Curated annotation (Swiss-Prot):
HAMAP family assigned to the protein according to its UniProt record, in alphabetical order: HemL_aminotrans_3 (MF_00375)
Catalytic activity from the UniProt record: (S)-4-amino-5-oxopentanoate = 5-aminolevulinate
Family designation: Belongs to the class-III pyridoxal-phosphate-dependent aminotransferase family. HemL subfamily.
A Pfam family it matches: Aminotran_3
The name this protein goes by in its record: Glutamate-1-semialdehyde 2,1-aminomutase
Compartments reported by the entry: Cytoplasm
CDD domains linked: OAT_like (cd00610)
Residue numbers bearing the N6-(pyridoxal phosphate)lysine modification: 272
Organism field: Moorella thermoacetica (strain ATCC 39073 / JCM 9320)
GO molecular function, one term: transaminase activity
EC number: 5.4.3.8
Keywords recorded for this protein, A-Z: Cytoplasm, Isomerase, Porphyrin biosynthesis, Pyridoxal phosphate
Length: 437
């Protein structure tokens, strides 16, 4: 059976979609272009599983690109949303006590976040944090890292990761040269390069923004001393250190990567998990910096739906579950089981891969490794990855359709899901070894 025969309704839906939306999707990677398939159209999610309109069931490791750490339609999240709809409403454009609760949870979990502002997306969080850093320091330049993705604001689409990397356009048309000139790009995990940049332009640099665990060129952990070195350099030059924890916040640890690695940034950006699957973002940090945000200070930022009760209640319900004893130990156990099995399956087939993992986020790079930065990530065999992806999808395993995206474990996954995934990978690796596509 051909792929078009296996997914006829999805093929028809996508044919209509491309006439209505650019590329047929509302976010580029969803189009499945880099893996050579038409995307399955999803009908529903339940726990660790997705079901498409053609009747296929998948074990899901995309988790809506990270937010669904509890799995799809977790009962406590559903109950919270139903209660909010029934008793409150959808949005008021006015303060609610729920906002206080979520802000309190975030600031308690992350001591570096002394005050927080809720927004509607990770992009809003990072662009607002950077404006704040520039306004606070009176400087204009920012240092980012090649392959790190911080949303689609102009000044971040310079050697970016995520979809920009997947489609080979890390520098997007439409980004003004004057904006790009104030963005300095350094290699991830290269502290010497950062030191050199600061020696040349340190007095002009407002901030360094970094994914403490890069997740948008695949999962790339920080080398020992890298994050601590960034903290030392930024303090020395009076620049701010911004952790983009949109992906890692409440995933790699309840207190995020800053808790895992013991680093205290000046500003933190959040999203994904704190909305429980609904659109959300947040940025926060030291009180003296955050008090510069309007209406307390002159640095403006606003949003119609910021702090809306639906997203906030879903986020609160999610964090409540994550705070239960044994939660992160469970995620680690499942993730380690999968890592061991995938490594063994690849080795048995003689397929060179590198498995990078931090907690419940991971990537299988088709690359003998090590993978520590943009250059080594992009040296991966994307054709082999595409073949692996197709083989896994046909066996009911739903992975991110890009070599350069992290995958995610959820609390809804079970040991038999992991074992099923390993068995599917064993067949997929065997196929790659003999040249199947």
């Amino acid at each position: 059976m051909t792929d078009s025969e296996a997914w006829p309704r999805s093929a028809a839906a996508f044919a209509e979609a491309v006439k209505l939306m650019p590329g047929g999707v509302n976010s580029p990677v969803r189009a499945f272009k880099s893996v050579g398939l038409t995307p399955p159209f999803i009908q529903r999610g339940e726990g660790a599983y997705l079901y498409d309109i053609d009747g296929h069931k998948y074990i899901d490791y995309v988790s809506s690109w990270g937010p669904l750490i509890l799995g799809h339609r977790h009962p406590e999240v559903v109950d919270a949303l139903e209660k909010t709809l029934r008793e409150m409403g959808t949005s008021f454009g006015a303060p609610t006590e729920l906002e206080n609760e979520l802000a309190r949870e975030i600031t308690t979990a992350m001591p570096a976040v002394e005050m927080v502002r809720l927004v509607n997306s990770g992009t809003e969080a990072t662009m607002s944090a950077l404006r704040l850093a520039r306004g606070y320091t009176g400087r204009e330049k920012v240092v980012k890292f090649a392959g790190c993705y911080h949303g689609h604001a102009d000044y971040f689409l310079i050697q970016a990761g995520s979809g920009a990397l997947t489609f080979g356009i890390p520098n997007s048309p439409g980004v003004p040269a004057t904006v790009a000139a104030n963005t300095i790009v350094a290699p991830y995990n290269d502290l010497a390069a950062v030191e050199d940049i600061f020696q040349k332009a340190g007095e002009e640099i407002a901030a360094v923004i970094v994914e403490p665990v890069a997740g948008n060129m695949g999962c790339v952990p920080p080398l020992t001393g890298f994050l601590a070195g960034l903290r030392t350099i930024t303090k020395e030059y009076g620049s701010l250190l911004i952790f983009d924890e949109v992906m890692t916040g409440f995933r790699v640890a309840f207190g995020g990567a800053q808790a895992l690695y013991g680093i205290r940034p000046d500003l933190t950006c959040l999203g994904k998990i704190i909305g429980g699957g609904l659109p959300v973002g947040a940025y926060g940090g030291r009180r003296e910096i955050m008090e510069r945000v309007a209406p307390s200070g002159p640095i403006y930022q606003a949003g119609t739906l910021s702090g809306n009760p639906l997203a906030v209640s879903a986020g609160l319900a999610t964090l409540k579950v994550l705070k239960k004893p044994g939660t992160y130990e469970r995620l680690e156990s499942l993730s380690a089981r999968l890592e061991k099995g995938l490594k063994e399956a690849a080795a048995e087939a003689g397929v060179p891969v590198t498995f990078n993992r931090v907690g419940a986020m991971f990537t299988t790079f088709f690359n003998p490794g090590p993978v520590t930065d943009y250059a080594t990530a992009t040296a991966s065999d994307t054709r082999a990855f595409a073949a692996f992806f197709r083989a896994m999808l046909r066996q009911g395993i739903y992975l991110a359709p890009s070599q350069f995206e992290a995958a995610f474990m959820s609390l809804a996954h079970r040991e038999d899901d992991i074992d099923c995934t390993i068995a599917a990978a064993r067949e997929a690796f065997k196929g790659i070894a003999i040249g199947d596509s």
